[in-house]
Amino acid sequence: MAKQAKARRLAGIEAMAKVRTLRTSPRKLNLVAQSIRGLKVQRALNELEFSHKRIARDVRKALYSAISNAENNHNLDIDNLVVAEAFVGKNLIMKRFHARARGRASRIEKPFSEITIVVREQGEAA
């Protein structure tokens, strides 16, 4: 039996957004997540808008969701928000087959990923 994961507790100055089913591999998604980690949210949105990666559009939506959660649910100032964490996880793998020569078949795996973005309010001095 697998060990149950504990839910992450957010501090009072944090907000989070999760996207569970993104149709890309975790490796490709992590390239985009690395590019926004630690940036101010406005800078991160610009990075994602002008990124040439296909999945950057979905990560941008998730970041907007985290910003909205911070503003509406936690009453945080969106001008002082920083992308504190952006981490990627594996999800299910859709399996398909590809017909090959002599009646054989090969397996095609189409991976799904999930991303969690945590934004944190940074003080005025930072």
From Swiss-Prot:
Domain of life: Bacteria
Protein name: Large ribosomal subunit protein uL22
GO cellular component terms attached to this protein's record: cytosolic large ribosomal subunit
Function: This protein binds specifically to 23S rRNA; its binding is stimulated by other ribosomal proteins, e.g. L4, L17, and L20. It is important during the early stages of 50S assembly. It makes multiple contacts with different domains of the 23S rRNA in the assembled 50S subunit and ribosome. The globular domain of the protein is located near the polypeptide exit tunnel on the outside of the subunit, while an extended beta-hairpin is found that lines the wall of the exit tunnel in the center of the 70S ribosome.
SUPFAM superfamilies per the UniProt record, alphabetical: Ribosomal protein L22
HAMAP family: Ribosomal_uL22_B
GO MF: rRNA binding; structural constituent of ribosome
Sorted UniProt keywords: Ribonucleoprotein, Ribosomal protein, RNA-binding, rRNA-binding
InterPro entries (alphabetical): Ribosomal_uL22, Ribosomal_uL22_bac/chlpt-type, Ribosomal_uL22_bac/org-type, Ribosomal_uL22_sf
GO biological process, one term: translation
Subunit text: Part of the 50S ribosomal subunit.
CDD domains documented for this protein: Ribosomal_L22 (cd00336)
Similarity-based family: Belongs to the universal ribosomal protein uL22 family.
